[in-house]
Amino acid sequence: MITKILNSPMGQMISTWRMSEEGLRLGNQILQEKDELGEAIVRAVKCVEDNPAYVSVGYGGLPNREGQVELDAAYMDGDTLGTGAVISVKNLKNPIEAAYRLSKRKTNSILAGDGAMKYASYEGLPCRNMLTESSRKRYEEEKKEQMKEEERRAYEGHDTVCIIGRSREGSMACGVSTSGLYMKEPGRVGDSPFIGSGFYADSEAGAAAATGMGEDIMKGCLSFSIVEKIRNGLPVQEACEKALEEHWKRLERRGYTNRGMSVIAMDNQGNAGAATTLEEFPFVVAGEDGCRLYVASMDQETGEHFLFAPDEEWLKNSKVD
């Protein structure tokens, strides 16, 4: 039985997908004990990047058409609006660490390819072969099918990991990391590392981030739109639903089909929200009382948005990570 949530969850951190839960617990512990926002977000993202069980982020990520794992990550400081990102990097163990350090720069803060890897080497950040045997085998088996362009879609179950955090004083920040679309063309980049589209943070209002089919998300500044609606007085949950609906309707009018988009957000008071075009999108909220899993849902016939707290039956039967 689904019990709909009437009020927005409250907390200091929010993240996308069930795969982020362990990392969010670690990040939340740092935030509660030390109130170090950047450290908390980076730690939470790194936990997902390091886990080969999650094939859309970091180590074990599914490769591009040539069998190489290409990674994107970004970090934004809501106090300064400083943003760092690395794009299309290979063999970098924790792209979020590089993005975080770059966010402190005034210029040259978004680096791609070889330039990003040279920076990581200069900073002494660890490298490793990011392609696991499991991902390699899946690639070898499925490349024979030569997946058609129109068949590519965001992962069933999980995609970009997005972490938003808020300090006790109201500072906001967010970090995102992904290995991108499976079997993508080499060099393909989605929405994740692009400010305003894949993420946005402004401590004067709040922060938001998106996950799903990047080519659809970056046809507008979805994350920025959510934060602006919060700034203009909309409750965070309403801002998520309204911004996503406006964005999706804009695409639908032009003949696009629903390939999956989801968003999370938090205002600078700690009110959290999420919305999706999927039937189910799990997200995690953390604060002084620990972590709690929630699910955003959209009725595929009516378009109605709602949140619910999953029960034991849902947790047992759901295949969504």
What positions do the PLM features span?
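Alpha/propeptide regions of enzymes that mature by internal proteolysis
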Residues: 1-321
